[in-house]
Each structure stands twice: as C-alpha cells, then as structure tokens.
A protein has these predicted regions:
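Post-transcriptional modification and biogenesis factors for structured RNAs
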Residues: 1-188
Length: 188
C-alpha cells in the first residue's frame, strides 16, 4: 500500500471546479473573526462542492495572506460574496427558496443526528462568531437551528465550527438515495 500522488487523485483544476456542478448548499459566515477559521471554511466548502460562501459583517474576504494560509488555494475555487448584514443574506436566501439552518445551541434546536432536510430545497448553513455565536436576529429569521452535541466541560464554540460544517454536509452528500441524480452526474 502507498499514498497516492496528487496527479493520481483525479482532482479538478480551479477552472474545472468552477464549472462543475455543486451540491445544493451555501455556507453563511456571521461575523467570523479568525482568518484561519475563514480559510478552513473555504477548504471544507471546496471539499464538499458548496455552491458558495457568503461572508457577512466583519468577516474578512480573500485575498488575504492568513485566509490563504489555511484555505490552501480553496479561496480561488469556491465562489463567495460579501454581505454586510447577515440577516439580509438570510432573507435573500429564503426568498431564493433556500431552507436556512443556523448551527447554534438554541431553544428548540435539532440535534445534528436527528436532522432531516427537505431534499427538494437547497440548504444554507449559518455559522456564527466564535464567541457570540449566530446573531439573535439571524436565528429569528432562519428556519431552525442545528445543534452539535459536546461532551467536554470547556469545549470552545470555535473549536466546533469547521468540523460541524463537514459533519453537516457529509450526510446529504453521501446519501445516494437523496442525491442519486446528482451523484451520478458528479461521478461521470
């Protein structure tokens, strides 16, 4: 057994990725302050072929050296846009037919393992500030909140941001029954 070389992995070029069909989800970043976290979101969005990332509030945007350091080139392939007000981004997504879910601990939140999205509608996942979380007005405008269980006493919210995106999108992306048509098109 040996590790594959990069050229053996069949990865898309930046141009091919931009033209490739994407999975029907968007990532919304609500005032993320860490540039390394922003870059990590770009890498995760690239890995799961997100439609785009919406950078809201004071969330910094590429090009930026610290974002590039953790994005490792994904900031060049993933579409992104800037919106100063996170709630405006959420309202526009809802008007465009998206179901919007905040990744946050809130009253009535759905545990991640129990989440059943409406597969006929695209999803938007909102991730909040590392300290304050998702803004209350954004939670009020969303369709609901997803909660990721934590078992440690001192678990930091920021620690769970990028892994939660990967966990959230992995299930529908791997569900052949729910995404059969897209799966077939993406693997041709």
């Amino acid at each position: 057994m040996r590790k594959l070389r990069v050229e053996e992995m069949g990865r898309l070029t930046v141009e091919e990725f931009k033209d490739a069909e994407k999975f029907p989800f968007v990532v919304v970043l609500d005032n993320i302050r860490s540039l390394a976290n922003i870059g990590s979101f770009f890498r995760t969005a690239d890995a799961f072929r997100a439609q785009k990332i919406i950078l809201c509030g004071y969330t910094q945007s590429p090009p930026h050296r610290e974002i590039t350091r953790s994005a490792i080139g994904a900031e060049l392939s993933v579409a992104w846009e800037k919106n100063e007000r996170p709630v405006d981004a959420v309202m526009q997504l809802k008007a465009d037919g998206y179901q919007v879910w905040c990744v946050e601990q809130a009253e009535g939140s759905v545990m991640l393992q129990n989440f059943q999205p409406q597969y006929e509608k695209p999803c938007a996942f909102v991730f909040g500030n590392e300290v304050e979380g998702v803004a209350d007005e954004v939670i009020a405008a969303a369709d609901g909140c997803l909660e990721i269980g934590s078992h440690g006493h001192g678990t930091r919210e920021s620690l769970r941001r990028q892994p939660s995106l990967a966990r959230r999108v992995r299930t529908p992306a791997r569900s052949v029954a729910a995404h059969r048509a897209m799966y077939v098109r993406l693997t041709k």
